[in-house]
Amino acid sequence: MRLLASVLLALFAVSHAEEGARLLASKSLLNRYAVEGRDLTLQYNIYNVGSSAALDVELSDDSFPPEDFGIVSGMLNVKWDRIAPASNVSHTVVLRPLKAGYFNFTSATVTYLAQEDGPVVIGFTSAPGQGGILAQREFDRRFSPHFLDWAAFGVMTLPSIGIPLLLWYSSKRKYDTPKSKKN
């Protein structure tokens, strides 16, 4: 009985020790393939799992240099006045990769106040990791329907199928002609 009481007291103390806002942040790529010259969609999700509102929340992502990525829509630096407890916010950015190759998608920085007069808390989002950005030509070669290739294949296989068919048909016609009956 004493053990149960001490465990409950410890859990109660831990739950009251972590009062204030606590943010969990994730960064994810929504595209299956990153392709040079095509839109790349990033989504940031921030969850407040704490007991009070997070104040002056700022999301900053400096991992996309302007010489490698163009911003199509959205912003890489965003501010929210407050995020209520047990709620979340999402932010989406659409980028356009300008160069093909491997790129390390690192985490973004999240800063906020856990309590009104408390210190600034610095956190990081999850990092998608290293990924390849395909060249437009390579992407088209891999994933296009190849209609022209299939048409050329069909034209090239016609002689190998058509010549034996014509020989068979002429032989069949020669030997299958009904003979006229003599009376």
UniProtKB/Swiss-Prot annotation:
Which parts of the sequence lie on the Cytoplasmic side of the lipid bilayer? 170-183
Q: Per the UniProt annotation, where are the glycans attached?
A: N88, N104
**Signal peptide annotation:** 1-17
Instruction: Name the Pfam families on file.
Output: TRAP_beta (PF05753)
Question: Is the Kinase keyword given for this protein?
Answer: no
Transmembrane regions: 150-169
> Might you report a single GO cellular component term?
endoplasmic reticulum membrane
Function of this protein? TRAP proteins are part of a complex whose function is to bind calcium to the ER membrane and thereby regulate the retention of ER resident proteins.
Its recorded name reads Translocon-associated protein subunit beta
Report the source organism. Answer: Canis lupus familiaris (Dog)
